[in-house]
């Protein structure tokens, strides 16, 4: 301990130090640490601070550079917060008291309440409920134009151009034709309005289609057709197979004999697995549909809420004696936007419209703004400052003669092209082109660009945060190991298990029908077989049976209809053929376990709400009654089932779950923890399986308490959990299972490529530490020669203090930390932990919750100011994906929720390499070149205007008017400039082969103040050469200076585009010649625009003049002088200091 460098200097722990600490913490108030304590719900550790005095006086930090200087930071933060409370407290009080009333009056948001819904009687509803209409439109007929204009003019630049355009209606400020300013602005607005109108019309059509869908409504007089938008709370709605459920309903009846049905929820939660739903038993037992109106029944439903995975309610039938009460849970609900997958269902509507779960969970994601857009915005502000400075300089040199303020405003108008209005249009069109290229890339099929505004972010990433299961791995589970405590079975010894199972059930089959199958192996122990072998055989039999029974898997059988060719689902007891059977479950782990029991001889052939059937190797079908089912939850991390063997009437409670949840439930053993660690180090996902045999009296007592808890309206979940926990005691440990999730194709080379590109990779997973570490090594996220620092579990501030010090002394090692330790460290040492973790080549966070994943992303963005990317495939990754600067979703076996919420969607992890190295890199470099060239285009013409005005005694007279100004940024130069989106410095194959090229992009050298200043100097040089050249060489033909300078300007811009291009595309050549042709053709039609001061001088362009040799060689000379030096400088730079890509492209 003596050689450790403490995070805070440790001094004597005397009474004075304790007093200072107490004073410090008492005065600190509810600072940031208090906020974090509330967020993470951790216990206060202040009582233990005497063990390790962490915060001392400021003197303790002197001359100790190794210590973190968080005490001054804490004091500054405390003082700032105190000042904020003093200044803002009164203001907030006034605003709250004065504005709350106004807000309440304006909004009057309806309070959501619990409700009582009578079956088939909408008129009995006590309150008015929203219409069941879907409305995704942003505007209506009256708000469309004002809304779109507001969205555009809330940005400073657009508002600036509007003010400039409106100024031309003032005669004293008018400096040209109105359309010179209104045409570009109108074009931008027209494009935006057209795009919004198309999107709005598509939304309107989709809404109309959904709201007009017809459903059968059950009434006293029979079935009637009703539109989805006309459905009300209390209606009884019939939904056919493959039909969308129109509103949130309670499941009353189904045509399926089992009283249950399957629904698809991929449009609600993104999960592709079917969900089993159960009808209310009271209404399912009714003989006919019409009997629903002959009973007096109602549903009590909780108030509408966001959580799609929970529901609390009751079903009550009043006309029976005594009244029937049934508890309702999530399995009795049919949420809107889900699809009925089997049978026909009847439900009573409980929530409609904006109160449905699907609508309440629909929110507009935060609009992500790319770093390049922010950088261009800063440069635009610099241009605006240059505009103001230049105008002031011109007025100053004019001597403030006359109405100088009017001249100042006129100069602002003359030089307004310094800020290019076409910049945003060009960049938006470029982003659309990049998205199209990404989706058309045959090397990454299935890639979808869902956010077209940030493709350049793919080229600036520094941190990549990835999920493990389904992202780095295939999410295809294969059963690999079964451990019984004394013996372990792997893939090469599975035939032994199959032999044990076969012998066990053959022995059972030879016994009388009343024989207990579970005791068969024990009775065999009386034979001549050694005792150990019989014991192992018995344990194998019990373990396999437990795995085959404890799950939520349902076998589904498909049969081909002869005439229609449609697929229908038959009853399971009609056909047990293996080739027709598929399994449906909420988790691929469940399916893997059931498939394994099938491979060793015990097959799940049928399952409904009340029973489950298993087929033994001898062909005998065993039936088990399902008494209770306890589904898996992320909080409990386990699931259980109580079954009764019909042949023996034996009641057994089976349970399986994660080792952390099961270790305190099972009986004492000395092997579980060790073997879980061993399997995890092999990269296996482990599950602990246990059982407990119940007597009839024990079960009846439990069932009564459980039913009572399920009928509770308040704190139902807590009461139910407490009852279930009463059974989870001293359970018999049966086995430990290991399932392997194999790596996706090309994960290793992809991760290596990303590391070589300078991207730091963090793996955030909910799996256990050993498994996460093993996957990190096998995927080469952490190289085998690299040290790994496993952050030991910490629960207090002092432990976190010591562990951070230990970690701080290590260099170039990967960090592995658990979610619990992460919470503690972030509570006390947020900045320090992030600072240290960012220095690691790789970080693995295990046992992470979805909230923690998103918080880690947010911390990285705030502390590093670097661009982050999150990639995942499941619903638990959505918050992380949305929190990152760039979110990538993978369409995997866990569904499409992550893919739909992401900015980019891919089908395999290996596609991220090409997405970043090729498309991300090209998008950033192209947009950087395009943005700077568009600004250059405005700067050069403004420079020429400044020279022109200075020559004419600083007069605020426009050099170019009318169509020349409109055409300059459109038909004359738009196509060549926009063709820069096709440019590339290296071939895609070279960019992938040398990912080090990507590392240069993170420095932002393609678009920086340095490159911006270079383009400013180029613009000033070229603008001055063009204008002074035109004035000097054409002294005798001075009236033609507009035509001369403008022609040289267009040629210069075309040559500059050619000079900027690094790889020619045939469309670039077409764009160059097309623009040149348009300009030459316009000379014959726009001759009135080519005279200087047409009204004053009366000069027009002589067509014969531009065909003379003198005109041509002088224009050519001016153009060459403006471009040749730049080409020479570029050539010398590439020879003397070549960029990295030039060595590969040569």
Curated annotation (Swiss-Prot):
Mg(2+) binds at residues 467, 469, 873, 877. Residues 165-172, 403-407, 960-961, 1033-1040, 1087-1105 are extracellular. It catalyses: ATP + H2O + phospholipidSide 1 = ADP + phosphate + phospholipidSide 2. It is an enzyme of class 7 (translocase). Found in most tissues except spleen and muscle. Most abundant in testis. Also detected in fetal tissues. Residues 1-143, 194-381, 428-938, 983-1011, 1062-1065, 1129-1146 are cytoplasmic. It comes from the Eukaryota. NCBIfam families: ATPase-Plipid, ATPase_P-type. This is Probable phospholipid-transporting ATPase IIB. It comes from Mus musculus. The lineage of its organism: Eukaryota, Metazoa, Chordata, Craniata, Vertebrata. The gene is Atp9b.
């Amino acid at each position: 301990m003596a050689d450790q460098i403490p995070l805070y200097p440790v001094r004597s722990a005397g009474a004075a130090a304790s007093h200072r600490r107490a004073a410090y913490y008492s005065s600190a108030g509810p600072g940031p640490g208090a906020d974090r304590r509330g967020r993470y719900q951790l216990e206060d550790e202040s009582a233990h601070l005497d063990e390790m005095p962490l915060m001392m006086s400021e003197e303790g930090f002197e001359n100790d550079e190794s210590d973190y200087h968080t005490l001054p930071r804490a004091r500054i933060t405390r003082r700032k917060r105190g000042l904020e409370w003093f200044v803002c407290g009164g203001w907030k009080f006034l605003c709250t008291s004065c504005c709350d009333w106004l807000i309440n009056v304006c909004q009057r948001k309806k309070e959501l309440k619990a409700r009582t819904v009578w079956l088939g009687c909408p008129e009995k509803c006590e309150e008015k409920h929203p219409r069941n209409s879907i409305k995704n439109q942003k505007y209506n007929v009256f708000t469309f134009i004002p809304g779109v204009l507001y969205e555009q003019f809330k940005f400073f630049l657009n508002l600036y151009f509007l003010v400039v355009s409106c100024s031309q209606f003032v005669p004293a400020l008018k400096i040209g034709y109105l359309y010179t300013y209104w045409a570009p602005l109108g074009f931008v607005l027209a494009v935006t309005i057209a795009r919004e109108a198309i999107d709005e019309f598509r939304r309107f059509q989709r809404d109309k289609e959904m709201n007009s869908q017809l459903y059968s409504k059950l009434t006293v007089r029979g079935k009637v057709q009703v539109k989805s938008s006309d459905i009300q709370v209390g209606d009884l709605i019939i939904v056919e197979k493959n039909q969308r459920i129109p509103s949130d309903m309670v499941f009353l009846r189904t045509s399926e004999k089992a009283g249950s049905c399957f629904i698809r929820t991929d449009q609600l939660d993104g999960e592709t697995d079917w969900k089993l739903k159960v009808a209310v038993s009271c209404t399912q037992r009714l003989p006919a549909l019409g009997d629903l109106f002959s009973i007096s029944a109602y549903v009590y439903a909780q108030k509408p809420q966001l959580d799609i995975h929970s529901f609390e309610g009751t079903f009550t039938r009043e006309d029976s004696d005594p009244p029937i009460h049934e508890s309702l849970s999530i399995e009795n609900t049919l949420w809107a936007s889900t699809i009925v997958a089997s049978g026909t269902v009847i439900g009573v509507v409980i929530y409609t419209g904006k109160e449905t779960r699907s609508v309440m969970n629909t929110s507009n994601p935060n609009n992500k703004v790319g770093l390049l857009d922010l950088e261009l915005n800063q440069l635009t502000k610099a241009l605006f400052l240059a505009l103001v400075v230049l105008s002031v300089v011109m007025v100053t040199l004019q001597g403030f003669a006359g109405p100088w303020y009017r001249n100042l405003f006129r100069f602002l108008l003359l030089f307004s092209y310094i800020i290019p209005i076409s910049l945003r249009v060009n960049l938006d069109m470029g982003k659309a082109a990049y998205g199209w290229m990404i989706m058309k890339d045959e090397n990454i099929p299935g890639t979808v660009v869902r956010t077209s505004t940030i493709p350049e972010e793919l080229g600036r990433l520094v941190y990549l945060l990835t999920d493990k299961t389904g992202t780095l791995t295939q999410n295809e589970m294969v059963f690999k190991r079964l451990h019984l405590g004394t013996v372990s079975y792997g893939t090469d010894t599975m035939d032994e298990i199959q032999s044990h199972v076969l012998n066990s059930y053959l022995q059972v089959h030879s016994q009388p029908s009343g024989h207990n199958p579970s005791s068969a192996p024990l009775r065999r122990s009386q034979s001549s077989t050694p005792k150990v072998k019989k014991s192992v055989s018995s344990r194998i039999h019990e373990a396999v049976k437990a795995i085959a029974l404890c799950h939520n898997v349902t076998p589904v059988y498909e049969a081909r209809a002869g005439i229609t060719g449609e697929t229908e689902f038959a009853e399971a007891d009609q056909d047990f053929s293996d080739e027709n059977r598929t399994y449906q479950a909420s988790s691929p782990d469940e399916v893997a376990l059931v498939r394994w029991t099938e491979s060793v001889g015990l097959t799940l052939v049928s399952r409904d709400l009340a029973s489950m059937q298993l087929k033994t190797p001898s062909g005998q079908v065993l039936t088990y009654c399902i008494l209770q089912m306890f589904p898996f939850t992320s909080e409990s991390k386990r699931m259980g089932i109580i079954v009764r063997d019909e042949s023996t009437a034996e009641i057994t409670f089976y349970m399986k779950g994660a080792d952390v949840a099961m270790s305190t439930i099972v009986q004492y053993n000395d092997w579980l923890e060790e073997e879980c660690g061993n399997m995890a180090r092999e990269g296996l996902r482990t599950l602990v399986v246990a059982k407990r045999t119940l007597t009839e009296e024990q079960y009846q007592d439990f069932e009564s308490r459980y039913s009572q808890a399920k009928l509770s309206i308040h704190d139902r979940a807590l009461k139910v959990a407490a009852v279930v926990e009463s059974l989870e005691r001293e359970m018999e440990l049966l086995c430990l299972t290991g399932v392997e999730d194999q790596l996706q194709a090309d994960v290793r080379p992809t991760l290596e490529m990303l590391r070589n590109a300078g991207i730091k990779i963090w793996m955030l997973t909910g799996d256990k530490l050993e498994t996460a570490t093993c996957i990190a090594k096998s995927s080469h996220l952490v190289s085998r020669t690299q040290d790994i620092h496993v952050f030991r579990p910490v629960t207090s501030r002092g432990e976190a203090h010591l562990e951070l010090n230990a970690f701080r002394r290590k260099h170039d090692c990967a960090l592995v930390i658990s979610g619990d330790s992460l919470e503690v460290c972030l509570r006390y040492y947020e900045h320090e932990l992030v600072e240290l973790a960012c220095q690691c080549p790789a970080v693995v966070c295990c046992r992470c919750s979805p909230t923690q994943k998103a918080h880690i992303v947010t911390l990285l963005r705030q502390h590093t100011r670097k661009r982050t990317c999150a990639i995942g495939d499941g619903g638990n990754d959505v918050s992380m994906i949305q929190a990152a600067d760039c979110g990538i979703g993978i369409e995997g076996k866990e569904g499409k929720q992550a893919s739909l919420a992401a900015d980019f969607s891919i089908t395999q992890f290996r596609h991220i390499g090409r997405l970043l190295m090729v498309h991300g890199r090209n998008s950033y470099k192209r947009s950087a070149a395009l943005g700077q060239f568009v600004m250059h285009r405005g700067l050069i013409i403004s420079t020429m205007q400044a020279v022109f005005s200075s020559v004419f005694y600083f007069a605020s007279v426009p050099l170019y008017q009318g169509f020349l100004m409109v055409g300059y940024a459109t038909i004359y130069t738009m196509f060549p400039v926009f063709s820069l989106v096709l440019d590339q410095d290296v071939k895609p194959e070279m960019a992938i082969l040398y990912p080090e090229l990507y590392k240069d992009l993170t420095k932002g050298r393609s678009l920086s103040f340095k490159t911006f200043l270079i383009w400013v100097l180029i613009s000033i040089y070229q603008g001055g050469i063009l204008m002074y050249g035109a004035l000097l060489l054409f002294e005798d033909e001075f009236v033609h200076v507009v035509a001369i300078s403008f022609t040289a300007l267009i040629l210069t811009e075309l040559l500059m585009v050619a000079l900027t291009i690094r790889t020619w595309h045939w469309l670039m050549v077409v764009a160059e010649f097309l623009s040149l042709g348009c300009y030459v053709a316009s000379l014959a039609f726009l001759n009135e625009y080519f005279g200087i001061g047409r009204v004053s001088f009366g000069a027009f362009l002589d067509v014969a003049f531009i065909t003379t040799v003198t005109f041509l060689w002088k224009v050519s000379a001016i153009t060459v002088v403006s471009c040749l030096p730049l080409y020479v400088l570029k050539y010398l730079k590439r020879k003397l200091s070549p960029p990295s890509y030039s060595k590969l492209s040569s």
